Structures are given as structure tokens and as C-alpha cells.
Amino acid sequence: MKAPRIMLAAGRSGSGKTMITCGLLRALQQMGKQPAAFKCGPDYIDPMFHEQVIGAPSCNLDPFFTEEETTQYLFCKHAAGHDISVLEGVMGYYDGLGGISTKGSAYDLAGMTKTPVLLVVDAKGMSVSALAFIKGYLQYKEDSRIAGVIFNRMSEMLYREIAPMAEKELGISCVGFVPELKECHLESRHLGLVMPDEVENLQEQVNLLAETLQKTLDFEKILAIAEGAEELSGKMPEVLRKVTESEAAAKVRAAKPILAVAKDEAFCFFYRDNLELLASLGAKIEYFSPLSDAEPPKNTDGFLFCGGYPELHAEELSENQTMRTKIRDNIRQGMPVLAECGGYMYLSESMEDMDGNVYPMVQAVPGNVYRTKKLGRFGYITLTPNTKDTFRNGGNPVRGHEFHYFDSTDCGSAWHAAKPLRKRN
């Protein structure tokens, strides 16, 4: 499959990747292109910004969770029908598992998807030193796939001097610069960036940045780099085909189960591919709001509670007693439920909010959720069930990602959690 594409990566978080990605997506749209957007890694919030810009869902690609064949399949599935795909990297380009490996990094994903990379260099306070920075990234891995450089927070006058030096001394294509735009800035909170709906004048900021990029970036070079990306097969991997064509899947499709998925301001962190897989297996997905609805959808066969910011809405969630009671009763009667992160917090006995107030929750699982003083657990983990009956998966390990400022007085004992590549559990 021919799929023009580029990845925007950087030397570290906070280099301007997200804002430049959004501006680039909008600029491509203004040029008449139909771009597709992707995010490297498990981040939920950056794809929401992409979606606000292009008006279509952005997708996560994570080389820790999926092998190369599956990763390519998911990319091709969502890139089909688009003129160009823009992948946003994560953290520093080479930063991967445990902070000691490139596995799971943006570099790893670029290799899996054979994607040419534009390195975003935050050049604030630098001139010639930026070349040493770039040289290090080019030479650290022979197959770096870095095909071009964007200098962020650099003046036009300095760029005109530095770009020719970089191209001559390093043999790298300089595709433009981004001047410092104080009007374009994304705030953050404890789980990362604020939500797109919370950013004042987001569309105006993105439009301003897009207009600027059309003047400061060489789109002819960028599009040529994207067009030069290698073709991918995009075929469905055998592991996925076996699941979707299995007898169990046929039974699920025949049963047409209703899956109630919590979705509102408190529960807003979803992976598009997970929901699409459930739908392809025959599940009828019905969204509901634990904040504002009186009760879950009727005739529900199962619950899905994803993450979000329930701690910002703890009082409202607690006050909706009818909803809490209905959910608790259904779960106690044996209804299947999958709850992660904020969704699990909601099902606990009580939850502490950001101001230290404690509110009763659904009380379907033991434990009281409390706020910690700092980020307690962060990064990828591998979960191994203590018995083969756990989760009915035959005792196979499950991969996950955690980013927690909250903890519970009862974390359970059904699984053993371990950090990959590190002696921590």
C-alpha cells in the first residue's frame, strides 16, 4: 500500500511537537489535502487535539502493545483514503521502555512503519550548538530515519544562517523554522495537557500557527519526503484474523450483546481501535454518562469504564446516587465489567478529589481511592495472572501502561505487575 507519511519527533517532551503537529495538519487541510493523524504511544490527549484540528479521529500506534505486522495493519487501515499521514512522536525520539531502551520509542515506531522523520529541534537560546544536537541524533543510530529538521523557536534571520550550515555539514534537509509564537501555547495539568475543549481560542491558535507554517516551512520538501516513504503490505495479521474468524466470535455476533460504555467529561480516554474491534465482533456499543444520565442503558450485557478525570467531578458523580446504585447492583449480580484507571476509581468505595474531599462512589470493588503527593507509577507494565482462571485468558500476560497520581487502599492480588527491562514489580 502506498501511504505518504511523516513523523514529527523531538529531543524531549516540551519541544513543541503537539502544537506544530496541529498546525501542520491544519496547513495541509488549507492546501486542499486530506490528512490522517496518529500518535506514537499510549497518550490519550494529543489525539484529541489532532481530532479537533482535522475533524476526524486520530489513532494511537504503540510498538509495545502490537508487533510490527499488527502495527502496520492498523496504520494502513486508518491511512487508507488520505493524501498524507502525520505521526506525532512521544517524549525524546529514542526514549523507550524503562528509560533504558529504544523499544517502544518513536524511533521504534518509525522503524516498524518505515516512516521518514522530521526532527523538531527546540532552538531557543541556541545557534550553532543546534547542529551538534542534530548530529548526535543522526549518528546515534545508523538507521535513524531522520530525513529533515524543523527548527522551533528560531528567528528567520538566524535560520537563514544556520540552515545552509546544517545542510552542508550534516547532509540533512532543513524543511523550515517556527518563530516563537507566544499566542500559541498549550497548558498542562497532572495527567498531561488540558483537554482541547478547555483551551481558550484553540481554533484561532491553530489557524494562526498554520498560516505561519505556510510561510516558514518548505511544504514542497515535506511532501516529497512523505511521498518517498516505503510501501507497506497492510494485511490483517494472523493473530487478529484468528480472533475475528473464530467460533467464539461467531457466537458473539449472533448474540449481539449490548456494551454500555461510560463517556462524558469524567470518562473520556479511549482507544479507537479497541472500540472498533468490539464493534466488529458484534457488540452494540451504547454510550452513557455517569455524570448526567439517571441510569445505564437498559438491557445492558456488560460495562466498560475507561479513564479520564473523575477526580475533577467526584462530587457530581457521587451525587448521582441512582446511577451508582444501578451500576453496583448489576455488577454484584454478575454483569461483566472492565474498568481501567479513572473508571476503576469510580467503581471503588470512595474517592478523594483534588481538594482533599472524600466522596462515596459505586462501591462495587473494595478500596478507597486517595490522592498521592506525586506521580506514583508511570510507564509500561506487564501483568501476569496468578491463576489461569483470572480474566479467562488462560494465564497469559497482559501488557499495560500506567500514569497514576492516585492509589487505592486495596489494589488486589489477582495479578503480578512487573516493569519491563527493570527489576521492579
Which positions does each model-derived feature cover?
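ATP-dependent carboxylate-amine ligase catalytic core
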Residues: 2-19, 25-113, 121-148, 157-161
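A short helix->loop->beta-strand "cap" motif at the edges of active sites that frequently abuts
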Residues: 115, 172, 332-336
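Residues that mark the start of a beta-strand
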Residues: 5, 33-36, 256-258, 284, ...
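Beta-strand->loop->alpha-helix junctions that form or flank phosphate-binding loops
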Residues: 39, 174-182, 284-292
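C-terminal and late-domain segments of enzyme folds
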Residues: 110, 215-216, 252-255, 267-279, ...
